[in-house]
Swiss-Prot record:
The lineage of its organism: Eukaryota, Metazoa, Chordata, Craniata, Vertebrata. The chain crosses the membrane at residues 42-62, 73-93, 111-131, 154-174, 207-227, 251-271, 295-315. It comes from Tupaia minor. Pfam families: 7tm_1. One of its GO terms (biological process) is positive regulation of cytosolic calcium ion concentration. Disulfide bonds join 109-188. It is a multi-pass membrane protein. It comes from the Eukaryota. The gene is BDKRB1. This is a receptor for bradykinin. Could be a factor in chronic pain and inflammation. Residues 63-72, 132-153, 228-250, 316-326 are cytoplasmic. This is B1 bradykinin receptor.
Length: 352
């Protein structure tokens, strides 16, 4: 392949990485030169907005002096996952700026890529959990009152974080900084020990990390939309009124934004697998997949800074919480004294 994807630098030997310069498919050289200069700036911009936005969201949820609801527990974990994710983006921005010459050492090569990979799984699993929670509230409201517990939501989030860390373990173990003599660089690459690992990787990435969660998300949200459309105002009365509907609109928007941002990456990752097993060939496909992966990665990264924007512009209850936090943090002025009360205080003062 002529270049590597940000999340999965894929070559299993140096000859593949050397194809960056030696491949006969050199039609996209100008596009790559432009990408090396422009993409790092965009990634750093996403990092800045994602860092500030997710810190703001976490502050609003965690600083209010009241317990989180079940839905808010999931949203806090989603914001925390996005925050951890954007902390790794400056390393990748510098890596692209250096044309994949990794300057940060072997440990950060493993850690940064492991964190990014874990976030991919944690985010979509949280989307499934959030969708399932809304499904219970809207479609099975009576049962949800007995089953929805904060303790269960926290336990679910802990399991999701653990599974995400487990699925990112191969990335942490197989990533390393290797010298590429032809290019005179040291690249952070994924060294797969056997060709069969390519199949295992695509099953993990596309099936476990997208298709199965996508099926669950479509199932839950399809029933949610059908319930809202079929019950109308009656559903609001049964499930607790407009508050639940506002939360549902926010969550449906978050889910839709996540799928739109991440679907292109998974499509191009599958095309990359087809190219590796020679199911598709030719310079057109090579350039199309390589450039598409880079742009799809950038598009996926935007989701981490898009969620806080959705909270502000779509989440009415979130804006209410922002106002509550402002009032909580703003010192209250004492109420003005009436004239009779003022005279009574002065009389007691002079009497003493």
């Amino acid at each position: 392949m002529a270049a590597q994807t940000l999340l999965e630098l894929q070559p299993s030997n140096q000859s593949q990485l050397s194809a960056l310069n030696t491949t006969s498919c050199d039609n996209a050289r100008e596009a790559w030169d432009l990408l090396y200069q422009v993409l790092p700036i965009f990634i750093l911009t996403i990092c800045a907005f994602g860092l500030l936005g997710n810190l703001f969201v976490l502050s609003v949820f965690l600083l209010l002096r009241r317990r989180l609801t079940v839905a808010e527990i999931y949203l806090v974990n989603l914001a925390a996952s996005d925050l951890v994710f954007v902390l790794g983006l400056p390393f990748w921005a510098q890596n692209i700026w250096n044309q994949f010459n990794w300057p940060f050492g072997d440990l950060l090569c493993r850690v940064v890529n492991g964190v990014i990979k874990a976030n991919l799984f944690i985010s979509i699993f949280l989307m499934v959990a959030i969708s399932q929670d809304r499904y219970c509230v809207l479609v099975h409201p009576m049962a949800s009152r007995r089953r929805r517990r904060r303790r269960r939501a926290r336990a679910t989030c802990m399991v999701i974080w653990a599974v995400g860390a487990l699925l990112s373990t191969p990335t942490f173990l197989l990533r390393s900084v290797s010298a590429v003599q032809d290019l005179n660089i040291s690249a952070c690459i994924l060294l797969l020990p056997h060709q069969a690992w390519h199949v295992a990787r695509i099953v993990e990435l596309n099936v476990l990390g997208f298709l199965l969660p996508l099926a669950a998300i479509i199932f839950f949200n399809g029933h949610i939309l059908a319930s809202l459309r079929g019950q109308g105002e009656v559903s609001q009365t049964r499930i607790g009124g407009p508050k639940d509907c506002k939360t549902t609109v926010l969550i449906l928007t978050l889910v839709a934004a996540f799928l739109v941002c991440w679907a292109p990456y998974h499509c191009f990752a599958f095309l990359e697998f087809l190219f590796q097993v020679r199911a598709v060939r030719g310079c057109f496909w090579e350039d199309f997949i390589d450039l598409g992966l880079q742009l799809a990665n950038f598009f996926a990264f935007t989701n981490s800074c898009l969620n806080p924007v959705i909270y502000v512009f779509v989440g009415r209850l979130f804006r209410t919480k922002v106002w509550e936090l402002y009032q909580q943090c703003t010192p209250r002025r004492p109420a003005p004294l009436s004239s009779s009360r003022r005279k009574e205080i002065l009389r007691r003062f002079w009497r003493n």
